[in-house]
Amino acid sequence: MIQVERLSRSYDSFRAVAEVSFAIGHGEVVGLLGHNGAGKTTIMKMLTGFLEPSAGTIHIDGQDIQTRRQAVQSLIGYLPENCPLYPEMTVIDYLDYQAGLHGVPGAQRPGLIRRAIARTWLEAKALEPIATLSRGYRQRVGVAQAILHRPRLLILDEPTNGLDPAQIQQMRILIRDLAREATVILSTHILQEVQAVCDRVLILRAGALVLDARLADLNRTRQLSLVVDRSPATVEPLLRTIPAITAIQHRPTTAERHEYLLDLDLGSAAAANDPLVIAPQVAQAVTHGGCQLFTLQPRTRDLETLFRELDDQPLGEARHG
């Protein structure tokens, strides 16, 4: 549904987004994750047509947003980080006003407004002035205006920003519900939000895309973690006799223990995603070489660990999980 190619945005000499490319299919729930200033909001604004890219292309539902901006925008519901609300208006009047901005015909507005209010659990607040609402309810009003016209793509920028734990949980439930009918892109700097509601994550760093992976695949590494009592001078020659080991990374833990991360090439066999298939060879090689084996296990990583690793690496091409 979304095809982004080499997207860039510069402000004078500052490059806010640098040649970002990705594709998102219909029905996916994708988290756009990065520190503040990583380029998330800039990408959101370019996806919605509110900001022109300096270079690159965006196609949504097969249409170029540069040449078909209005048609593309009719497919999108957008919740900006600070959604502009009119505090003197009631919720229902504000949604009627927004329906007009979305081009919803007058005859269709009552039904669509009722639907948006019901989906965001605003029935009890529909006649209340927005000024009287809590932050959590105001965020729901922002979501309600984004889904009024039944968009095919829903873009949410920091939807849980400033909410308390109970309100965050309610917003997560709402996002999962909305994802039944629309593709959802969720921008956040909070790891837990991506883990709670997303199927896939795009991680940005300094305007560059450094990871594109499905969350379910993050724990499926082709690496073994080996801990023995010997230094690389002894261990690495033993490990290099095993053809499936393509790289060895040494991580000393104590004077008596050394950890080695082993990158594996297991081919295309059915067991290719299970690094344990090579573990017996590794164990045999190091023990026959006189090493004391402490642990040998598949390396696992969660999103927090991966995010920290990416922060420590030099910027380069995006990694795909």
Where on the chain are the PLM-derived regions?
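ABC transporter nucleotide-binding domain
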Residues: 170-266
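ABC transporter nucleotide-binding domains
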Residues: 2-4, 9-205, 209-211
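Positions that flank functional sites
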Residues: 114, 132, 253-255, 301
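Hydrophobic/anchoring residues in structured secondary elements
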Residues: 9, 247-250, 298
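Short secondary-structure boundary/hinge segments and terminal tails
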Residues: 76, 117, 135, 219, ...
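C-terminal coupling/interaction segments
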Residues: 267-321
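Surface-exposed charge patches
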Residues: 97, 115, 237, 284, ...
